């Protein structure tokens, strides 16, 4: 907490959550980079973030991006929460949960009935209604269609061999809406 001249602590400003803009990509990448280095999140090229900017929500305090998350629609009834991250000084404040719930509301507004994630943070997602799943969450017909996608996240969802190094240790989780 900041200390005003009186010596009394003041509350930090509550981050505002909004849709991302192209100008936010540098801030998103700066937030994600240390997590990608530790292999908590998948590293992505800048162009990938620009292509997906419309999928992102960001949390901002005083012009600084302190949180982000994306919702990627995979099929008529299924979307994935991706790249959910908060700044170290925001951990434990509930910001990650706020961003997640905004993404879930986006999914509902789109008519999606299930939200999926690949994560190491199972307790966090369990607190938000996600449950661990085994096997495929789609029919064989949808699986065959998804195989045609060029998106690396879809390949991870399908558990394809070529992306195994990205997903080792991750838990597949699903939330019905």
For each predicted feature, which ranges?
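A short, internal acetyl-CoA/4′-phosphopantetheine-binding micro-motif in the GNAT/acyltransferase core
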Residues: 84-91, 120
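A conserved beta-strand-loop-helix scaffold within acyl/acetyltransferase catalytic domains
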Residues: 42-61, 67-86
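Conserved acetyl-CoA-binding loop-helix of GNAT-fold acetyltransferases
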Residues: 92-105, 117
